[in-house]
Regions:
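Mature catalytic core of soluble alpha/beta enzymes
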Residues: 2-333
Length: 333
């Protein structure tokens, strides 16, 4: 069985997360890149009519971003909901809300997609600043996914709530793309949207886990996986330093400040894009013990990297991972 090699790296350049891919396919392959969902996206498609397939995928991602999920676009569905404290929603949006609310509940609120107002105070995607604690407390008073009421064809939440699909939107896009590829004659594909990747096909893939302290092209370990979705969340993606302290973009919903769970990065492997994306954030904030238990509850595999350069690997990946940087080691079990 031939193997396709994927080297994954997430870096922050001008506050844009970039994933670098190196994939070897046979002939009849199309490669393209574009910008959407506030990040760089890349496609590598192998199959019949791959040029047309690539164009459709790009249009799908751009439409999903601007017309549905973007809270910055005043004409999107999410912006409409935020401006009206909820409203009627279609079946797909209902399904996404349902999944994320379940993750919120099972993570004991450590995953929360109503922190848009808090995130805006930090502005990690722009100037990046340390907000006043009073402003953070005020913003937190207008958050809390547990306050969302999801009904058959509608959703409602409190005044001044800002629902933000940023921690799950890329995974949602991967699920939509996978469903589309299933209906085409595509043999193999690698789709990268920020820190989330769809590995599509029946052959093995080798995925490099980025070195949190190294350059964009370096990795600390390699995973051998079948077709799946892989999402990584790391404090190195977007951050700034002030008075000798580093502030990263992954916020703890309980405090409104960057998580201090002792985790440097989390990689989640799942057949579901939305789960891989949302759980990578949830597990980062929960920490290793509770995060591992949460991922296991959803049938997902994980690799945690802690502050001591130790890798904590779930049972299903232990025979599929090798360390490639000798300064890192596996945690003692």
């Amino acid at each position: 069985m031939k193997k396709k090699i994927v080297s994954v790296a997430v870096i922050a350049i001008a506050f844009v997360a970039v994933v670098l891919l190196c994939v070897k396919f046979k002939n009849n392959t199309t490669e393209t890149g574009f910008f959407a969902m506030n990040t760089v996206c890349s496609l590598k498609i192998n199959g019949k009519e791959n040029d047309a397939v690539s164009k459709v995928i790009q249009a799908m991602v751009e439409n999903l971003d601007t017309a549905i999920l973007s809270r910055k676009n005043e004409n999107s569905e999410v912006s409409r909901l935020n401006g009206n404290s909820g409203g009627n929603i279609d079946k797909k949006l209902h399904g996404w809300f349902s999944v994320l609310l379940d993750v919120c509940k099972k993570s004991e609120g450590k995953f929360d997609f109503t922190l848009g107002a808090v995130s805006d105070l930090w502005d990690f995607g722009g100037e990046a600043r340390l907000p006043d604690s009073v402003l953070i407390e005020e913003a937190l008073s207008h958050a809390g996914a547990e306050k969302i009421v999801l009904e058959n064809n509608s959703v409602y939440y409190g005044d001044s709530f800002t629902v933000d699909f940023g921690a799950a939107g890329k995974g949602i896009a991967l699920d939509e793309i996978k469903n589309y590829l299933d209906a085409t004659q595509t043999k193999d594909a690698v789709v990268s949207i920020g820190g989330s990747i769809l590995l599509y096909g029946e052959k093995d893939f080798t995925v490099g886990i980025r070195n949190p302290e190294g350059n964009a092209g370096s990795h600390i370990a390699v995973l051998k996986v079948d077709g799946c979705c892989v999402s990584t969340s790391g404090g190195y993606e977007r951050f700034f330093e002030k008075d000798g302290k580093t502030y990263h973009h992954i916020l703890d919903p309980d405090t409104g400040y960057p998580s201090e769970s002792g985790v440097v990065s989390v990689t989640v492997v799942s057949q579901s894009g939305i789960l891989s994306d949302a759980l990578s954030t949830a597990c980062f904030v929960l920490g290793i013990e509770k995060g591992s238990a949460l991922a296991e509850e959803y049938g997902c595999e994980t690799v945690f990297v802690d502050e001591n350069k130790c890798l904590h690997v779930s049972e299903g990946l232990k025979d599929k991972i090798e360390i490639s940087d000798n300064s890192y080691s596996f945690a003692e079990q």
